[in-house]
UniProtKB/Swiss-Prot annotation:
It holds the Pfam family PhdYeFM_antitox. Keywords: Plasmid. This is Uncharacterized protein y4eA. The keyword Glycosyltransferase does not apply. The lineage of its organism: Bacteria, Pseudomonadati, Pseudomonadota, Alphaproteobacteria, Hyphomicrobiales.
């Protein structure tokens, strides 16, 4: 039943859900439908790690801002300040 890379069809999932879930607890498993990847099953720890990693609301400071992004931010603030002064 296992396929290279932990990939299973939806039919496999219907027949052997217990085995596939047990594998998904160890590493992500791809579920295919009509030979195309459609879903990924992964354990809750991996899911929560991914959600934290990509949460747009994550907190940061100017000290933790990457240099390139800080430069862009400073340039935007300067441009805004110049525009504001010329409009007065």
């Amino acid at each position: 039943m296992p396929r290279p890379g932990g990939s299973y069809s939806t039919s496999d999932l219907s027949r052997k859900s217990g085995d596939i879930i047990a594998e998904a607890l160890r590493h992500p498993v791809t579920i295919t439908q009509r030979n195309k990847p459609r879903l990924v099953l992964l354990n809750i720890d991996d899911y929560e790690r991914l959600m934290r990693q990509y949460d747009a609301r994550s907190v940061g400071t100017l000290e933790t801002l990457p240099g390139e992004l800080l430069n862009e931010f400073e340039a935007a603030v300067d441009a805004y300040g110049e525009t504001d002064e010329t409009n007065r």
